[in-house]
């Protein structure tokens, strides 16, 4: 059976960027990685109503920068910035260094894979028919400029005794084209019949000229790294 690699992971260094940006020695690497995971889990749980898509963490020597991408920046900032100051204190304590928090607004949440998957999950938890929920997000995405969108829902759909998977697609989603800007996310909807898994792929167009270099340049860098390891 053919298995699908994560579309964002395979494009790292080509047209996608890392969510964690720092260098560490071998003894500190696992500590920094675990710290990043804890911070992300806390922020996603704390800001569950703020439509947070991703959290980018950058570390310097004595401080860190956390960028929160959200469709509802007002909820994150709070009244007169009170909520974001509290977040800053908690995250600084978790990471053990001073932290600066930036907020980036997502202009079109209908074209963000995580927010689309989260939207479908919320509708399923409110007992909306899954076909209606999926077709609604397909229409919204194509109307706002997506060249293609694909959605898979898996589990006991409509309370069926036997779990199954169903696919829905609008437009095209070229997973094998590295220059294709494909956003991907998965999410779980907790219903009374169990968890329903949701996967979303959104194709936004091709990136022909990017600062991270062409595919040949990326392959060349990979070859140099292999030689250096030897």
UniProtKB/Swiss-Prot annotation:
It comes from Vesicomyosocius okutanii subsp. Calyptogena okutanii (strain HA). Part of the 30S ribosomal subunit. Forms a tight complex with proteins S10 and S14. It comes from the Bacteria. GO terms for biological process: translation. The keyword Cell wall biogenesis/degradation does not apply. Binds the lower part of the 30S subunit head. Binds mRNA in the 70S ribosome, positioning it for translation. Belongs to the universal ribosomal protein uS3 family. InterPro entries: KH_dom, KH_dom-like_a/b, KH_dom_type_2, KH_sf_prok-type, Ribosomal_S3_C_sf, Ribosomal_uS3_bac-typ, Ribosomal_uS3_C, Ribosomal_uS3_CS. Pfam families: KH_2, Ribosomal_S3_C. GO terms for cellular component: cytosolic small ribosomal subunit. Residues 39-107 form the KH type-2 domain. SMART domains: KH. Keywords: Ribonucleoprotein, Ribosomal protein, RNA-binding, rRNA-binding. This is Small ribosomal subunit protein uS3. SUPFAM superfamilies: Prokaryotic type KH domain (KH-domain type II), Ribosomal protein S3 C-terminal domain. One of its GO terms (molecular function) is structural constituent of ribosome.
């Amino acid at each position: 059976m053919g298995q699908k690699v994560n579309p964002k992971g395979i494009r790292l260094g080509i047209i996608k960027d890392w969510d964690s940006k720092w260098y560490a020695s071998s003894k500190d690497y696992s500590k920094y990685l675990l710290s990043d995971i804890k911070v992300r889990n806390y922020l996603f749980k704390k800001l569950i109503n703020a439509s947070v898509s991703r959290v980018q963490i950058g570390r310097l020597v004595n401080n860190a920068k956390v960028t929160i991408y959200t469709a509802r920046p007002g909820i994150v900032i709070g009244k007169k910035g009170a909520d974001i100051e509290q977040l800053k204190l908690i995250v600084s304590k978790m990471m053990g260094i001073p932290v600066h928090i930036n907020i980036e607004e997502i202009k079109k949440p209908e074209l963000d894979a995580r927010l689309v998957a989260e939207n479908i999950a919320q509708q399923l938890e409110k007992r909306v028919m899954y076909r209606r929920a999926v077709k609604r997000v397909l229409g919204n995405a194509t109307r706002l400029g997506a060249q293609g969108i694909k959605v898979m829902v898996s589990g006991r759909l409509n309370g069926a005794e036997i779990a199954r998977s169903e696919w829905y697609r609008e437009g095209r989603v070229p997973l094998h084209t590295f220059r294709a800007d494909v956003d991907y996310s998965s999410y779980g909807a907790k219903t009374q019949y169990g968890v329903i898994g949701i996967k979303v792929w959104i194709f936004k167009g091709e990136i022909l000229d990017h600062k991270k270099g062409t595919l040949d340049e990326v392959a060349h860098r990979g070859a140099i790294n292999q030689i250096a390891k030897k």
